């Protein structure tokens, strides 16, 4: 039976749903827009500004998760799903997630009017890059154990920040960092945590690169030495940062599922497998390989429905909730398994590292993608942490 799973699981959640006429019209509108505006090839990088302007001109499509009060499109859950699905069907210019998808919801919910007016416009147009200052050497999965200290000055005008963050993604290009700091050690460790916004060009901020297993430089260590942060850069109340961070982590984890990218990546892996001759057929014809593909397609379909339930909760005014841990856990596992399929298809041609490529074009970089993908089940909360969250908050286990 499993040999035929791949041929039976062909539908996405959208094809199972009976879309209302207005949703079908919206889907057509998105498809026409993509056909007319998406840059191709290298233009994806040189014409990024034009792409995002065109999205903005559609009424907030450049910030699809934002509320209409802040310039977002106010999509229904179904429209949001359709939009993500259609945008994920082909490569589109990337938008860094830290400002638009992570910090912005915190500012909208907990920031002052002055902070919203100051930061949201530059977050939206991409002129200012942000990074996330959460993890520390002794506070990764146990994030509430963080030690970076922020002391309020005697006159109450600024915080003096000292400490270290690690695994800080894209800190090397960030203009600002939103940072969890400890302002008090009294009470439970989740208490006394304060959410600060810190400029990266302060002379007391130092960024040191970390080269990952895949050979890339995307994460860093960030050191703070006597950094003065004006009190107006504090988001919300002092000592309430943990509450704000939990909401941000839920948004981050649901976004890390990367469902549409996985759908596109799996289709690419299938095309690659069709190029590999095995006996009288192709690698994709092998029952063992076809079964792996079919299982992934089935799991992706299940994950799509979980995402839709999460979107419906958010649209009703709630947080993503503990189900975001399911999205993060399964979504990142699927991402890793797709890199394994590409590695299997590349075979011995994936072996060269930094040397001149040979063999099929898709083989070059397959090993780097596989190794780099090992981190997906760690960042944003390790899989073990997500399982604990699911056990306690979804299954009700103690």
What residue spans do the PLM features occupy?
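Amphipathic, small/basic residue-rich leader segments at the start of a protein or domain
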Residues: 1-97, 108, 118, 122-125, ...
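Glycine-rich phosphate/cofactor-binding loops in nucleotide/flavin-utilizing enzymes
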Residues: 2-10, 78, 82-83, 102, ...
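Glycine-rich beta->alpha junctions and the first turn(s) of the following alpha-helix
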Residues: 17-19, 205-303, 376, 392
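C-terminal helix-coil-helix/basic helical segment that borders enzyme active sites and/or dimer interfaces
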Residues: 39-46, 278, 287, 301-358
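N-terminal glycine-rich flavin-associated loop
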Residues: 95-114, 140
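A short, Trp-centered hydrophobic/proline-enriched beta-strand micro-motif
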Residues: 126-134
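A structural signal for short hydrophobic beta-strand segments in well-ordered beta-sheet cores
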Residues: 148-152
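A short core secondary-structure module
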Residues: 157-208
């Amino acid at each position: 039976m499993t040999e035929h799973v791949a041929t039976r699981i062909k539908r996405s959640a959208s094809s199972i749903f009976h879309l209302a006429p207005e949703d079908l019209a919206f889907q057509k509108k998105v498809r026409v827009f993509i056909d007319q505006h998406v840059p191709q090839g290298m233009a994806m990088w040189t014409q990024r500004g034009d792409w995002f302007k065109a999205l903005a001109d559609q009424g907030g499509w450049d910030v699809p998760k934002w509320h209409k009060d802040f310039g977002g499109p106010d999509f229904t859950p179904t429209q949001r799903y359709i939009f993500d699905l259609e945008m994920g069907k082909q490569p589109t210019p990337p938008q860094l997630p830290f400002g638009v998808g992570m910090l912005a919801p915190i500012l909208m919910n907990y920031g002052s009017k002055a902070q919203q007016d100051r930061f949201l416009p530059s977050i939206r147009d991409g002129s200012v890059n942000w990074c996330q200052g959460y993890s520390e050497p002794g506070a990764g999965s146990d994030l509430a154990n963080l030690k970076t200290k922020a002391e309020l000055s005697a006159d109450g005008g600024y915080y003096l920040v000292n400490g270290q963050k690690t695994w800080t993604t894209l800190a090397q290009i960030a203009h600002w960092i939103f940072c969890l700091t400890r302002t008090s050690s009294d009470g439970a460790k989740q208490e006394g945590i304060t959410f600060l916004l810190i400029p990266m060009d302060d002379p007391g901020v130092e960024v040191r690169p970390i080269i990952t297993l895949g050979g890339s430089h995307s994460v860093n260590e960030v050191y703070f030495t006597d950094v003065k942060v004006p009190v107006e850069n504090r988001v919300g109340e002092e000592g309430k940062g943990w509450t704000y961070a939990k909401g941000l982590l839920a948004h981050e984890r649901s976004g890390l599922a990367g469902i549409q990218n996985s759908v596109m990546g799996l289709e690419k892996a299938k095309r690659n497998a069709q190029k590999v001759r095995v006996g009288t057929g192709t690698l994709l014809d092998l029952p063992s390989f076809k079964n792996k593909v079919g299982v992934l397609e089935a799991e992706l379909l299940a994950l799509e429905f979980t995402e839709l339930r999460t979107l419906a909760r958010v649209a009703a005014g709630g947080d993503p909730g503990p189900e975001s841990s399911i999205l993060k856990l399964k979504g990142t596992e699927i991402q890793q398994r797709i890199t394994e399929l590409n590695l299997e298809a590349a075979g011995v041609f994936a072996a060269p590292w930094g040397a001149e490529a040979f063999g099929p074009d898709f083989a070059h970089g397959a090993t780097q993608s596989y190794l780099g993908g090992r981190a997906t089940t760690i960042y944003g909360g390790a899989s073990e942490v997500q399982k604990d969250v699911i056990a306690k908050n979804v299954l009700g286990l103690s």
